[in-house]
A protein has these predicted regions:
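Residue-level signal for pocket-adjacent positions within structured domains
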Residues: 14, 39, 54-55, 61, ...
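Conserved, well-folded catalytic cores of nucleic-acid-processing
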Residues: 16, 31-34, 47, 66, ...
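Alpha-helix capping and helix-loop boundary segments enriched in small/acidic/polar residues
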Residues: 26, 46, 60, 85-86, ...
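Membrane-embedded alpha-helical segments of transport systems
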Residues: 31-36, 56-73, 91-104, 208-214, ...
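Transmembrane helix-loop junctions at the membrane interface of multipass transporters and ion channels
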Residues: 42-45, 59, 66-91, 265-276, ...
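Interfacial loop-to-helix junctions that mark the boundaries of transmembrane helices
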Residues: 83-96, 235-246
Length: 307
């Protein structure tokens, strides 16, 4: 019989996929609570790039920081009313978000070139088969597996922190609140960053949630024992100006609101995802050092110009 034909040569290997920027998926994921963005980094297959995305996630402003930013822009930087003022305020907010994205990408690049070196990987995002969603099952899984899970982490830190804030606001040494004494202690550090001790203390005590930073400031300025709310931006601006706020103060508060340590829920989520105290500390220190550097530069420039 004739000899069998030679086996066909194997097909050439497919070309390697072009490396993509998987870290960008964490940028929009941090606009809701940053904890959601940290959990969303699970889709990144490369452990190195997943870690970079987790570490830089807090540089993206979560929804808890937007009320403070909008109030500051409206009170100190928008000088006209009507559609022109609204457009100017929106442009300033967009500029701050672009700044956050730029800093996030810059820090990611820095981490990739230093402590987390490696070869960029490709991102393959598989699409599941399309089918009609089961609304009831989606709601149940969302509430049980996600909403209650994140809220449980928040309560474990927020409840003790709320008790600490209440004690500091209601316990007094003589006629002075403990809250005010701590603010006076932090005054030199706050002035170095273009703020004051009350603002710096509010950010520290706002660790459970970024939404309570501004109410803590007002509570300390007014020497109240509970969180307070001022009706109207005009009244709020008058109160802040009476306590020494300037354009430099507002700019530094806006920058530090963008770049400071993540909230308690995000910090706990980072630890759960990385299982490392070292990387959790890096995730806290990276945005904090960024904010301290920017605020110190703005404050120094303001003093140099005599503003």
């Amino acid at each position: 019989p004739p000899p069998p034909p030679p086996p066909a040569p194997p097909p050439p290997p497919p070309p390697p996929p072009r490396p993509g920027p998987p870290r960008l998926f964490a940028v929009p994921g941090g606009v809701p609570p940053n904890a959601v963005g940290v959990m969303g980094c699970r889709i990144i297959q490369s452990p190195r790039e997943r870690l970079i995305a987790i570490l830089t996630n807090a540089l993206v402003p979560c929804n808890g920081r937007f009320p403070t930013l909008i109030a500051l822009i409206s009170m100190f930087f928008v000088l006209v009313e009507g559609p022109v003022g609204s457009l100017a305020g929106a442009a300033m907010m967009l500029g701050l978000i672009v700044l956050c994205v730029g800093v996030t990408l810059g820090c990611s690049r820095l981490l990739s070139a230093t402590v987390l070196k490696g070869v960029p990987s490709a991102l393959a995002l598989e699409l599941p088969p399309f089918r009609r969603p089961k609304v009831g099952q989606v709601l149940i899984r969302s509430v049980l597996d996600r909403t209650l899970f994140v809220l449980g982490r928040a309560v474990t830190v927020a409840a003790p922190a709320g008790l600490v804030i209440w004690l500091l606001a209601n316990l007094r040494v003589g006629d002075t609140q403990l809250l005010r004494l701590l603010a006076d202690t932090l005054e030199p550090a706050g002035r170095f960053l273009g703020m004051d001790g009350v603002i710096l203390l509010a950010f520290i005590l706002g660790f459970p949630a970024n939404e309570i930073v501004l109410p803590i400031m007002l509570m300390t300025y007014l020497s109240q024992g509970t969180l307070v709310e001022v009706q109207g931006l005009d009244s709020l601006r008058a109160l802040l100006v009476a306590n020494g706020w300037t354009l430099t103060t507002a700019a530094c508060v806006a920058l530090f609101s963008l770049f400071h340590w993540p909230c308690s829920t995000t910090t706990l989520t980072v630890y759960k995802e990385t299982h490392s105290l070292k990387w959790t500390a890096v995730a806290v220190l990276l945005p904090t050092l960024t904010g301290v550097t920017l605020c110190a530069l703005v404050s120094a420039l303001s003093r140099l110009l005599g503003a």
